[in-house]
Amino acid sequence: MNILVVRNDKLGDFITALPSIYVLKHHNQENKVIVCVAPLNQKLAEACDFIDEVIVDDPKSSVFRLAKQLRQAHIDLSVTLFSNTRVAFAQFLAHIPRRIAPATKIAQIFYTDRIKQRRSEVKMAEFEYNLALTKSAFPDIDLSYPQPLLKFEDAKEVYQEFATSYEISKDVVAFHVGFGGSSDANWTLDEYVVLIRAVLQNGKYQVVLTFGPDEQKLCEQMQKKLKGEDIVYYISKNGLVDFAKIISGFKYFISTSTGTYHLASLVGTRTITFFADTLFASAKRWKSVGELELQEHHMIPQKNLDRHLVFNIIQKKMQSI
């Protein structure tokens, strides 16, 4: 059976789909699992050994081109974890016999199986809603998956090359101060400076600040604020897979709830993560796919007094890790 899984939005969202993709593949090893992803996630999808084929949905191309790609894949069943009118209509045009998706938005009219999940109620995490949707296709499917879900044979070699090039000899505590996606709360850069210096004080770790390829200005801002400190500044320019291999060697990855947090959890790195104090952006919804014991979640309150109290707790945490 050829099974299509659609999750063609941002990095963190795609990572929440990976457990579902894994269980669909392992439900029957003869299944061919095809994913439809955004261009950003193509290389990461291709690195997963439980994904057989990757279809890249270029949002600038026509819906008819996407439908042609889907039709050529001879898909028997599709499971759409995130839907919009474009991908729904493309599947309809491709004549996929069975099309499963959450019963949301007008796009649901193009699916054969519309599943009521009410994700806005946040009764479970996003990746758990995704897993639950696979039950609609195969009621007896085993929803368990390995953690970490993604391993690389050459991860240690890539990390060692990174460590050698930056003369790193200690365990690494990494901070990723940028944010995007569903993350709508974060510490200010000056607050991050305080947290970073708290880690530096104990002398146990090498602090690394990581940045996306389009965050050069943010990197320069942090370099000015932390001038004279023993810090490695790393701008990821070699793609998500290379970045994931490097992250897998870190002791801690500290960030707001963004795609890189999910990437760190995916490869088994211990995370300390900051979430907005709202149900939509909370840890309850956006906890990641890795071992829960390796994830430490903190909500950033909206009120200044409460925010200050939580910040003091985090600062003490940074001094003691």
Mark where each language-model region is.
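Catalytic machinery of carbohydrate-active enzymes
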Residues: 1-321
